[in-house]
């Protein structure tokens, strides 16, 4: 039994059925509604590239309801968002935590939104290592570089000084939509679609 709804449309050739995500893609809407991992990142990157090829001048809308996930997978999405020509508008529905919040903030300036009851959470990268001391040291250095890079990007995207980002991501930092707007993670709390 499929849990993905199907939409039936009338065309001049009869009826055509789509899964709901394919139908939304026709309207340039991409959904990130799961953990950020290699599979979700590949799907989102492919959709971003497809929509750019379809029309490089029309905005793309990325709806986010995600607890976060893999940094490398998230950075693949982030880099693609910055690389493609169309503006990517981000909209938080529900929760954007960790890498989900990072991607929310990475939307085109002026086009980053959250619905009124959304929750946004930022924090530092998580990592757990085991093995030889030398290997643990290598991984610790790597995660510190990643933390520095993520904080630097968040500082640029939010307009917050780097020191503020470093302090505020030291622990889980939860915000409602209005607090996220004041912080610079989003540009507007959207009550009704314009």
Swiss-Prot record:
Keywords: Cytoplasm, Hydrolase, Protease, Serine protease. Its EC number is 3.4.21.92. It is found in: Cytoplasm. It catalyses: Hydrolysis of proteins to small peptides in the presence of ATP and magnesium. alpha-casein is the usual test substrate. In the absence of ATP, only oligopeptides shorter than five residues are hydrolyzed (such as succinyl-Leu-Tyr-|-NHMec, and Leu-Tyr-Leu-|-Tyr-Trp, in which cleavage of the -Tyr-|-Leu- and -Tyr-|-Trp bonds also occurs). NCBIfam families: clpP, PRK00277.1, PRK12553.1. HAMAP family: ClpP. This is ATP-dependent Clp protease proteolytic subunit. It comes from Clostridium tetani (strain Massachusetts / E88). The gene is clpP.
């Amino acid at each position: 039994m499929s849990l993905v709804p199907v939409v039936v449309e009338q065309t001049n050739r009869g009826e055509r059925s789509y899964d709901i995500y394919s139908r939304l893609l026709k309207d340039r809407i991409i959904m990130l509604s799961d953990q950020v991992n290699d599979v979700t990142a590949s799907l989102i990157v492919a959709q971003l590239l497809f929509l750019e090829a379809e029309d490089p001048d029309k905005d793309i809308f990325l709806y986010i309801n995600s607890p976060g996930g893999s940094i490398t997978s998230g950075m693949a999405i982030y880099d693609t968002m910055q690389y493609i020509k169309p503006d990517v508008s981000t909209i938080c529905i529900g929760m954007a935590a960790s890498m989900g919040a990072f991607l929310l903030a990475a939307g085109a300036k002026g086009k980053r939104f959250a619905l009124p009851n959304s929750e946004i959470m930022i924090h530092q990268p998580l990592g757990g290592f085991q093995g030889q001391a030398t290997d643990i040291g290598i991984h610790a250095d790597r995660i510190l570089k990643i933390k520095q890079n993520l904080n630097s990007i968040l500082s640029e995207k939010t307009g917050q000084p780097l020191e503020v980002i470093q302090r505020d991501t030291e622990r889980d930092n939860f915000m409602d939509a209005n607090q996220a707007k004041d912080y610079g993670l989003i540009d507007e709390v959207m009550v009704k679609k314009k």
